[in-house]
């Protein structure tokens, strides 16, 4: 169950502590919460970390599920996300560092293949979605499958 030590994350918004504390008290996963608000689990987690904007409907549904005062939650989440400041560069958290390492090692290869397939341009991180799946192979090994989908 993902939780948050706010002292380790000084750049997160005020709402992060409130949301993560309520999530822990309710013993909910991001998948549980995502199902309730009608988003995927990565988009839901991004709201908790202040990296995605919650709609008014999201705030109402979060308040309902997490038993939080909707007005207070809306006040804390009403601004625009301050994206990209929540992670030190290079990252120190091992899993986040591995994702960074993937971009270091494969970034230019991704760029070359994307340019060959789509021409000159960039993949949007705004018109964007992502998903995480778990696969188990025939030998019982678990594999993480991360899909990145951005408008070209």
Curated annotation (Swiss-Prot):
Matching CDD domains: Cyanase_C
Top enzyme class: lyase
Pfam families reported for this sequence: Cyanate_lyase
Residues making up the signal peptide according to the UniProt record: none
GO MF term list: cyanate hydratase activity; DNA binding
Active site location: 98, 101, 124
Tagged with keyword Membrane: no
SMART domains in alphabetical order: Cyanate_lyase
EC number, as in UniProt: 4.2.1.104
SUPFAM superfamilies: Cyanase C-terminal domain, lambda repressor-like DNA-binding domains
Domain of life: Eukaryota
Swiss-Prot/TrEMBL catalytic activity: cyanate + hydrogencarbonate + 3 H(+) = NH4(+) + 2 CO2
Disulfide bonds: none
GO biological process, one term: cyanate metabolic process
Keywords recorded for this protein, A-Z: Lyase
PANTHER family: CYANATE HYDRATASE
Family according to the record: Belongs to the cyanase family.
Function: Catalyzes the reaction of cyanate with bicarbonate to produce ammonia and carbon dioxide.
Record protein name field: Cyanate hydratase
